[in-house]
Amino acid sequence: KLGKEMELFTIIDEVGAGLPLFYPKGALLRKTIEVFISEQQEKRGYKDIWIPHITKGTLYEISGHLDKYDAMYTPMMIDEHDYYVKPMNCPHFMMLYKTLQHSYKELPVRYTCTTTNYRNEKSGELSGLTRVRSLTQDDCHVFARPDQIENEIDLMLDMIKEVYAGFGLSDFYVRISLRDSNNNDKYIGTDNVWDTAENALRAIVKKTGWKYEEAEDEAAFYGPKLDFMFKDAIGRQWQLSTIQLDFNLPERFDLNYIDESNEKIRPVVIHRAVLGSTERFIGVMIEHFAGAFPLWLSPVQVKILPISEKFADYAEKVRAEISDAGIRVEMDDSNESLGKRIRVAKMEKIPFILVLGEKEVEAGTVTVEMRGKDKGETHQLQDFIKYTLSDIEKKAIW
């Protein structure tokens, strides 16, 4: 409901269930989140790749998805081969790594790609943005030596911690998602390999001091996971970030690196998505903040309301200066009464509303109504811009 009211996204029957479309404000929200994630990845040494959205079935035979994964769409026939829209990205990462020769000195190789996957979810399980058929992931795969596992997962945990702080997310625990030990048919790989991977994740999580629990039958078919379970403002639980430790896909794709003795050695793969999926993350954030996003995340950060038409020139000057500073700003100079325009801006949950009239024009100031406060305050425009930029930069939560 909020998504449509705030002009963020919509789902239309003619397009299809579970296939959201994003309005400009929603697209801007997505972009803001994805740029934040990209910045976090870049400073930690992740390298962007790009992969196509359809793939020959041969790739999914190698990976095991055709046998073990049940959310794939019916294939299309192209040049006498079955092609699938991709439900996940792991096999493409494996193939990119495999096409190049790697030395032990190069590892870890950190590949990342923000891309959309398509999954044949059952109609009854679809729900807003939190369960969709087209889902975008900030997907990362790290190819590492066994002695690098702990450091690489620590790097991922550090990124998750910093990202969650930016969104003000603190009520979460880690679920160690294990295999169903009574049903090996659901998985690829030997018990030995699974035991090694599960024990490694246990040790790493215990060292963090974070709350955690173990859950059987929640692992991916190729390896155990750390799933970050978040509780929103009204107590509902959501899975967001995930880290997966994988000894099996490197085996199936025959991946290797050359060690110091010039021998071929199998790398370990660590899968990671901080948002989980962009769509679900946005859906959870909409509900958690009831649409009142933190300032840095708000699609519109400032709304300018001239009291009447004769103050429009000053309002436009203020708008231009705020916009030039890199702050997202809109002006409502419609013929509606000031009271109604203020009510609309508050319904839109705009962080800052600037009301401009005779007093502000004469003094060269702005009167600022901050979301959640009853009274406006008057400031010099440059002072307002300065502290707004400061709050955006430090990702203040209020």
Question: Model segments located where?
Answer:
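NTP/phosphate- and nucleic-acid-binding module
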Residues: 1-398
